[in-house]
């Protein structure tokens, strides 16, 4: 499913309204909110709800969950006003349905993963991230772009892992993903975005188009 369209851009790890509104104003298509307590970018549901209430109506809001119960995920979706669920844990293919929300399944690329792993997930998109033991994203490590290119030719792929304003244009040129996802690559510190880096990342992600 190789993409020839302008890649969608998701800014993940949003924790405050200032970063959210700036990313939106710069043209981000989606914002990600991390509900994994082990992350330095964790944001509580009340704060997320307040942020989302201030956002433009056509912006995609994504909740990132790691091995949380379906009941808890549904509760958070309704309370916060999320419209997309991103599953970043060990969820099996039959655990990835949360209608009416769209679902993104994150997979950390490692040796031995064959096509059956990717085709088993009937989700809106696959997010490809770097494999780092005991880490669920936000590591700043790049995934294998060559492998990602192969997967993106067959599936709707959001490329993540180690992206930043300096390399995102090359990543888009090689992989041709449906979208790109960044968190640590546009930060001053974990949980606080660098406005200039956010603006540059979004511009460079679309440079080829």
Report residues per predicted region.
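Conserved N-terminal beta1-alpha1 strand-loop-helix module at the mouth
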Residues: 1-209
């Amino acid at each position: 499913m190789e993409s020839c369209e302008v890649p969608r851009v998701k800014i993940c790890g949003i924790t405050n309204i200032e970063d959210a509104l700036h990313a939106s104003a710069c043209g981000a298509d989606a914002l990600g909110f991390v509900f994994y307590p082990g992350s330095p970018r964790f944001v509580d549901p009340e704060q997320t709800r307040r942020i989302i209430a201030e956002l433009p109506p056509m912006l995609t809001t994504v909740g990132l969950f790691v091995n949380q119960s379906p009941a808890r995920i549904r509760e958070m979706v309704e309370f916060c006003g999320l419209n997309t669920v991103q599953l970043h844990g060990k969820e099996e293919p039959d655990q990835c349905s949360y209608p009416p929300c769209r679902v993104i399944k994150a997979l950390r690329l490692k040796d031995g993963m064959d096509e059956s792993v990717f085709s088993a997930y009937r989700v809106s998109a696959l997010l490809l991230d770097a494999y780092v033991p005991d880490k669920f994203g936000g590591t700043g490590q790049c995934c294998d772009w060559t492998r990602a290119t192969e997967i993106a030719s067959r599936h709707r792929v959001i490329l993540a892992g180690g992206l930043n304003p300096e390399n995102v244009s090359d990543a888009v040129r090689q992989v041709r993903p449906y979208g790109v996802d960044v968190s640590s690559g546009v930060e001053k510190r974990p949980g606080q975005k660098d406005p200039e880096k956010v603006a540059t990342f979004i511009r460079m992600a679309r440079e080829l188009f």
